[in-house]
Amino acid sequence: MATTNDLKNGMTLDIDGVLWNVVGFQHVKPGKGGAFVRTTLKNVLTGKVVDRTFNAGIKVDVATVDRREMTYLYRDGADFVFMDSESYDQIPVPPGVVGGVADYMLENTIATVALHDDAPLYVELPASVELTISATDPGVQGDRSTGGTKPATLETGANIQVPLFITTGEKVKVDTRDGRYLGRVTS
C-alpha cells in the first residue's frame, strides 16, 4: 500500500482489480479546498488511457510487476515461447499479450516480458530492431534518396513503407512502436 503522494511515473496500480500504469501525475493544491492528485493512467492490458483524480494522501494499491529480460524462442501452436535469461525457464505467452510486437520478432530476439503473479501482461521490444527486406518492388531509373516510398515485406512477414532506393535483401532499422523505416543498416 502506498499513498497518492508516493505516485511516480511508471508505477503500476491495482484499481478495482484492473492494472494501470501511471503515465503522468500532478499534485494540485488549490487556494480553496483540499489538495488532490491528477493522474493519467494507461490500462496495462488494453492500452486505454484515462485521466483520474485522487484526493491527496489516500491509499492506493501498488501492483508488483516483474519485468524480466527474455529471449523469444519459437511458436508453439498459437503461443509464443520465451525463455527467461536468468533462470532459463520457458514461458508460453498468448498472442493477445504479445500484440503487435510479433511483427518485429525473430527467433532469439531479446524482449522484456512483464509478469504479474507469474502471468505475462505485455511484451516490449527495444525501440528499434534490424530486419531484412524479403520482398519489395525493384527501384527504377531516377529513384532518389529523397522522395516517395514503396511497400516492402520484412523477413517476419510484416509490411512497412521504405524509400524507393531500398532493394530486396537489404537490412533496415525499423521502429517497433509504429513500424516506421528508420534507415539502412551498414555493416
From Swiss-Prot:
It comes from the Bacteria. Keywords: Cytoplasm, Elongation factor, Protein biosynthesis. PROSITE patterns: EFP (PS01275). It is found in: Cytoplasm. Its main location: cytoplasm. Pfam families: EFP, EFP_N, Elong-fact-P_C. One of its GO terms (biological process) is peptide biosynthetic process. GO terms for cellular component: cytoplasm. Pathway: Protein biosynthesis; polypeptide chain elongation. Gene3D superfamilies: 2.30.30.30, Nucleic acid-binding proteins. Involved in peptide bond synthesis. Stimulates efficient translation and peptide-bond synthesis on native or reconstituted 70S ribosomes in vitro. Probably functions indirectly by altering the affinity of the ribosome for aminoacyl-tRNA, thus increasing their reactivity as acceptors for peptidyl transferase. NCBIfam families: efp (TIGR00038), PRK00529.1 (NF001810). Belongs to the elongation factor P family. This is Elongation factor P. It comes from Parafrankia sp. (strain EAN1pec). The gene is efp.
